[in-house]
């Protein structure tokens, strides 16, 4: 059924793909920001611009949803998908603002690793969203969703290790609190990527 309905309203997939491209762009900018730990304000401003562009795409998608009689799949799934995708960029923006404003003395290897995992998750979000136009690629979609799930688990493990190390080695309570917020936001990005993967899995399994 999904294959028969998709050609009637391809605009949704254009919007999903455009938003996913912004997600990857934002994640790369964030990874570069944390990796180099320099020009923080400039990185944060670029991420703000990316997030604003993504917000416009989200608004356009929701407006289209209200105006379209035949949708490529369930309306609630469309709304959930674009909303969760937008959540990813909102969190990327939150991390960038926190890093720029918190006056951190340093960025830890664990924060860099989490940012890299976030970028890998976001790149796979773009892949699964791009594959949604063809349900015959269900195996590839589900495989990539599984990769997102594994990356989210990796982020959980890195965060637990990072917090343990932070509490053992950092004597400045303010720095502990600031880094903990950064870690939590980064890990939550991977949670939202996993949410997207779960939504996509549901779409594929229900319509293939």
Predicted regions and their residues:
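Cytosolic, long alpha-helical scaffolding segments
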Residues: 1-208
């Amino acid at each position: 059924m999904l294959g028969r309905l998709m050609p009637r309203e391809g605009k949704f997939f254009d919007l999903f793909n455009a938003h996913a491209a912004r997600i990857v762009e934002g994640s790369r900018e964030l990874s570069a920001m944390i990796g180099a730990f320099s020009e923080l304000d400039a990185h944060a401003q670029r991420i703000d611009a990316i997030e604003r562009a993504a917000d416009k795409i989200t608004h356009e998608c929701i407006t289209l949803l209200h105006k379209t009689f035949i949708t490529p799949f369930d309306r609630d799934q469309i709304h959930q998908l674009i909303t969760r995708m937008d959540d990813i960029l909102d969190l990327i923006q939150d991390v960038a603002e926190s890093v720029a404003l918190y006056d951190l003395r340093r960025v830890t290897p664990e924060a860099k690793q989490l940012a890299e995992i976030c970028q890998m998750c976001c790149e796979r979000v773009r892949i699964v969203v791009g594959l949604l136009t063809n349900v015959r690629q269900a195996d590839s979609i589900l495989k990539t969703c599984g990769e997102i799930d594994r990356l989210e688990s990796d982020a959980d493990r890195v965060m637990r290790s990072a917090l343990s190390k932070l509490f053992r080695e950092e004597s400045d309570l303010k720095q502990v609190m600031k880094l903990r917020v950064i870690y939590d936001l980064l890990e939550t990005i991977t949670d939202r990527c996993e949410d997207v993967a779960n939504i996509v899995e549901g779409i594929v399994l229900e319509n293939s």
